[in-house]
Amino acid sequence: MANSKTAAEAAIHGQIEKTTAWKDFLALIKMGIVNSNFITTFTGMWLAFYFTGMSFLGNLDIVLLTMIGSSLIIAGSCAINNAFDRDIDILMERTKTRPTVTGKIQPGQAYAFGILLVVLGLIMLLMTTVTSAVIGFIGVFTYAVLYTMWSKRHYTINTVIGSVSGAVPPLIGWTAVTGTIDTTAWVLFMIMFIWQIPHFLSLAIKKTEDYRKAGIPMLPVVYGFEVTKRQIIIWTACLLPLPFFLGGLGWPIVALGTLLNIGWLVIGLMGFKMKDVMKWSTLMFVYSLNYLTIFFVAMIIITLF
């Protein structure tokens, strides 16, 4: 590991990409993750307004505090993750140009900045409801400590543990409005929790060699592709009943969710027939991204009519 890390460091420092401070900042906070969670947080909040009958425009203070606060804690958690993972990020093609790896942002700076963002975000969430702030803290702790610092490097169940943190944004949005969690909020949480596992296992198949080089015990690294495929199918199938608990949004959402789930399951089953595993995992990964966007945006749109 030490020799490979030394070689990687030499290669990286010899070919450091010229980037702006802004680009390094966006890489540090993993802006793609922040953006995707923005959608799910907003959906949870929007549906809370819809089901309670509260005015969206009449509560723009809650909207701004929730969206900015949740984005800050996610960005801060990602910065902490980048700082902690710099020793393994240097070994993977996908992550070797992150600013914490190239030295453009020092670990201490990343930790301090990440903690600052988390604290500011939690304060903003606390200005909405205590419940929202508590859930936000649970998300941060799960991602930064239970996932990043503990399970990621030791257990194949790391994906499941990390999925808890990725599932709390809809709960943050919902509880910022209501202060309580009801069935619809839990369904959004479960959709996000279950969705992440086949999503990230598909990515793990695509990046198996990267994870193997870094010594990260992802499921396909430890148990191979066939076991991973079966796990993907099982978790995808677990999504099937969830749309039926969203009947309050009308049958079109139930139908859309069911079709999306069946489509994903069919593509998953194709993995046992397709010879090109990488092509299949890419198809699964791309479908998962479209699944999330279509389903959550549709939940918002349906309430406008």
From Swiss-Prot:
Known pathway: Porphyrin-containing compound metabolism; heme O biosynthesis; heme O from protoheme: step 1/1
Entry superkingdom: Bacteria
Subcellular compartments: Cell membrane
Membrane protein topology class: Multi-pass membrane protein
Keyword Cell membrane in annotation: yes
Pfam families according to UniProt: UbiA
GO molecular function: protoheme IX farnesyltransferase activity
UniProt key word Mitochondrion: no
TM ranges: 38-58, 60-80, 110-130, 131-151, 161-181, 185-205, 227-247, 249-269, 285-305
Single GO BP term: heme O biosynthetic process
Location, primary (coarse class): membrane
GO-annotated cellular components: plasma membrane
Reaction(s) this enzyme catalyzes, per UniProt: heme b + (2E,6E)-farnesyl diphosphate + H2O = Fe(II)-heme o + diphosphate
Top-level EC class as recorded in UniProt: transferase
Keywords: Cell membrane, Heme biosynthesis, Membrane, Transferase, Transmembrane, Transmembrane helix
EC number from the UniProt entry: 2.5.1.141
Oligomer status and interactors: Interacts with CtaA.
Miscellaneous field: Carbon 2 of the heme B porphyrin ring is defined according to the Fischer nomenclature.
Family: Belongs to the UbiA prenyltransferase family. Protoheme IX farnesyltransferase subfamily.
Record NCBIfam families: cyoE_ctaB
Role, per record: Converts heme B (protoheme IX) to heme O by substitution of the vinyl group on carbon 2 of heme B porphyrin ring with a hydroxyethyl farnesyl side group.
Protein's UniProt name: Protoheme IX farnesyltransferase
Originating species: Bacillus pumilus (strain SAFR-032)
Lineage: Bacteria, Bacillati, Bacillota, Bacilli, Bacillales
